[in-house]
Amino acid sequence: MNMEQLYQERLTRYVTALRNEKPDKIPIRPFVAEFTAQYAGLTCQQVAHDYTLAFEAAVKCAREFDWDAVVANMVYVWTGLTQAAGLRYYGIPGIGIPPTVGFNYIEPPEDQAFMRA
């Protein structure tokens, strides 16, 4: 099967499932952002800051694991914008947390929490 035929087969499968109809088999489209980075030999920080690297990592996994579809990159963000907005509790890979760790909530000390019981 050539690339175009494979694409059409997967597209049909995916769209059929989205229409709540019965595809030939269950389409696979995992949400595995941090995994794709690690599998491609990259850090979470690299894929969070470089969309091209993130996309290449997603494509590598899609090809090697035979996925039907893939999210181009769920972890790419404009980190400067999030920092400028003053998001104090948002851990960005390589900024406040290790580069190998995915995005995290940074819990403040209880006496500094903005939400209290």
Describe the role of every protein-language-model region.
Residues 1-117:
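Catalytic cores of TIM-barrel enzymes
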